[in-house]
From Swiss-Prot:
Protein name: Uncharacterized protein MJ1519
One Pfam family of this chain: UvrD_C_2
Binding-site positions, ATP: 586-593
Protein species of origin: Methanocaldococcus jannaschii (strain ATCC 43067 / DSM 2661 / JAL-1 / JCM 10045 / NBRC 100440) (Methanococcus jannaschii)
Domain of life, per lineage: Archaea
Signal peptide: none
SUPFAM superfamilies for the chain: P-loop containing nucleoside triphosphate hydrolases (SSF52540)
Amino acid sequence: MRNLISLIAWHDSGWNGRVCRNPKENKYCESFGYVIRKRKYEFCVNNPDANLGNSRERACSEAIVFCKGKVQEHNIRFPAIFYVDRKNRNEHEIKMIKKEIEEQLRMINGKYAILYVRENPLSENRVIVGCVKIKEIIDGSKDYIRKKQSPNRVGRGIVFDVENDVIFALPYQELLEYCKNKNKEIEEILKEFNLIFEVGDFERYFKGMSNFISDEVAVQILKKGLEIVEEFNKFREENQDFDKYLTDENIAFRPHVMKKFDEFAENIKKVIAELEGSKYKYPGLPGVLYFLGMEDAYSRYIELWKNEGEKGEEKLYNALIESLENRKENLEFGITKKVIDKFIAQKEEFREFLKNYAVYYELSAFKLEKIKEQYEKEFINLDNIIKNPYILVEDLKENDSFERIIFEELDSWERRRLGDKFNPYSPYRVRALLVEILKRHLSSGNTTISTKDLKDFFEKMDKDIVKITFDEFLRIIEEYKDIISEKVEIVKKEVKNNENKEIIELFTLKEIREYEEIIENTINYLLKSKAPNIDLNPLEIREKLRIKNENKKPAGVDNEEYEKALDMQTEAVVNLLKNRVGILTGPAGTGKTTVIKTIMELMKEVLGLNKIYILTPTGKSAMVVNEKLNNLATAKTIHRYIAEEFKDYFEGDNYFILRLDKITGNDKKEIDALIIDESSMVDIETMGRLLGTIKLDNLKYLIFVGDINQLPPVGAGKPFYDIYNYLEKVNPQSICKLEIVLRADSKKIVELSKLFLDIDKEERIKILNEMFKNKETLGDNEIYRIKENIGGIEKEIITIEVVKDGNIKKSLENAIETILKENNTEDFFDFAVFNDKLQILVPTKTKGEFGSYMINLFIKQESKFIPDKYKNKMLENWFFGDGKVADKVIQIRNNYKKWVYDTERRKWVKEHGVFNGMMGFAYTFKKWNKYQKKYENKTIIRFYYPKIEAYTDEKEMEHAYAITIHKSQGSGFENVILIIPKGLNKFVSKEMLYTAITRAKKRLYVIVEEELKNFLETNISDLARRKTNLLENFNISYLVPYIENRQIITINGEKVRSWQECVLANLFHEVGIEYIYELLSEYLKIGVLPDFKLNIKNRTILWEHYGMLENEKYRKRQKEEKEPIYKQNGFEIIKLSEINENTKLGDKVLIISTSEDLKNNSQVLEKLKTLQQIS
């Protein structure tokens, strides 16, 4: 039966019926439109911590969720609000969907509501904060919910007794207050205790304001909730002073709730037992009846269940089956001719599904419509589903309005349907479970996983659901390979482990493997044949490139570098035209666009090729490319290309699905040359779909353009990276690298970015020394300046400010003022917004105080750059703009059919579209004649590229004074301010920092909170962590403990310089010793760069490994140069071989290991265990 998920706005005192204690600081609620539209913000700011009682004067409707005692409007605690997507639906369909939602809401009296927050200070993700038992549903006609419902909205008020109906509430606000008062970092606590209840695998249900979930899903969520509550109890045991923050009337926010914290675990167990023990046999019956046209289906079902229980349910089911089989009405049960006629109108397979399957499944009529839609579109085969219902898990397609059916749901439904005949060892069930695991890994970016990954995931699943052991799971997979292989491809891979050879198995979804095969076949086909015969004169090409570089050497670039850059560009043009497939890679400013323009001109002028396509992953990048190409070709997004060229095979309105299986050879596109720009952003499915549409016989050139060091795509896989690695092995001349930056302002920026690449130690130290050359102190803060002489003028190109006084906002304002002053202006909006010359970048959207969400609200509401007369307007309007000030915004969804106004051609363009990543600024429409009154006061966005305007849909836009680094990929900005808050070490990767730094074209200002190491030290690699097997590029090093290989990756995913260091890292991991490789902060403190820093029982131990003592120069450097520096800094030096139980460790310890030690890894393990004991 149905339960509720409901979104509530973050409240800094636990929704205790009071105004937030710090309303100005707590801005997480402001993304909820009513905070602005009701204009209650000022009330909150002026009345912090005021008791709301029954007052309606509050910004967020949910401030009273856990308020003590009764509240207004019949004890309503929070609203349940559902929005119906109107896209591609007529008014009748919308009315029916709304009616079904209203009917389903009747079913949740006495059921349970899971409460969650969206924007919050705890996590980048949505977080569950509690669960309550629903006592009553208040009708939407009540004034509290609004008498006048919007045409696509259904609203109800939820009532529960705060004394008796709270199943659990997680004390997150109390935890933050505890950390603040104890001067503790919450990130440190979270390293030890798993306290944050992120929605994780359940994310599909946590969309919009409210959603319904089945008992089965509710049970899974509650089981995770039980783990979190028990973890909080462990935390309480070790931090007993935390309890007063829960129950002490003087400091606790909601002691009337939290005094029962000890009972929460038992509450959850009781609810789980209740939901698992539900006796409903046909919970899908009301959905089937509503689908067939019985508008009061849910009400009838509830009434029969209340009055007669299982017997009433059985009566309704039998009456339905009898009426359908005999084609005869039964008005006693509401089964009219209309119901029977609609059933007859269905295809036979769907009738069978409705009668004998759907009645057991907890599916709404809306979901049945979606299943029918996918059946009619031939996404799924109902004949096969009737034979094997688990296909619903494997084949149903998901979109924004339809969550796929997960294994746990369908499996519980099948147990209900089959009863004693249920077989947990069915190969079809096992296959569906395997597919489910692979789909969840796919959502994390992994296209391929090993048996180890499979086991790790399997063992986290609920054993009561899985019903079989992992060994049984593998045995069934092996025994029924023919059945498994219909949906999953299993590859055996040979791995060399020292002198031994091991066989590992890799698992990939069949659909993903098909995309990989398309890519592999394309690459290998083009490699086997020669490119068109073209007479290339390198000297002429070089001159052509010189002219394109404006026939002059850029200021700040010396002659030797300039000529070398031209050599590289010339070589790139020649090699890319000599190979049918190639890669052009390099950071911004190295001339990639110049090379591509030259290649396209030669393709046209010399080879006569006209069908040249440039495709990009985002609309923004397509617009930027078009601006640079001067009509040589029209760039468009991959999505638009597919939608336009293959509209007969493309489902683009509700699903992004291209029916490649139906595109025959003749239907494929004849293209002379395909250039894919920003290739690092293209995921495996998009790349596979694209290449699957092209007739390879006609394709003369395929060129991938991008920066190989950037972040992997948001979607699954890393095809650009895998193709690069493959070509590097089989055809290295087809890879063209541009390394010399020809923008003088960018040169130092690119050099700094190399800190996050795999460069040697000497180059790293050279860059660091350049950085430390101009170090200053400003109060408590440290400032590092990197300058460049450009045209005889010394310019500050990079500023790195380490903020130790805690005032990031002040430092941000100072950074903005510095950049404005350098550009001879004081007008922030003219410079940063209207002309897009300044961009703030941050790693996260909502995590912590300085995600893009909070920075954006600070800029528009509090910063010194808002003129006083505009402050109220900026505060009261979520998006605002006029000629003086405006909100900078970014489009976050593709809208292919959006009409826009072309400001250059001064005309409306039908279905031009606006695309994810496009940026611009808002302004409020003012009517200038009576015909435009309906648009008055609507917000319009003026986009930068192309120069178009469009009316906004607020759900498709976000503020963009600050954006996340991920959103910045594919864009460049003249001036960049990068903010790196503390506590994000596990989140920020090398690729993320590299991408952020290289977004800056002329000026970079980095603001680092607390310590420089928060910026410089990261061993995390998103590319290394992502598991793929495209072109057999699966990285096996994390599976096998010790593999001798240059630049090897450890079990933890970081690259080390030698196999011996990898051995040590993996041994540390094996015994549970935390370590960091090549910790730059130690270099900053002592002047040498140790191989490892260990953390054992809060004792810091440095580690140097001597791997080449047979080399005299190496030995001398270690003994005569490095060791004295350690001694000067007070380090006691101990050899690993000398450690025993009697060894005494001082405060500063350096351990030295040698190659000799690693000849016996078992002995090293024992030494490490001894080290743990004596520390």
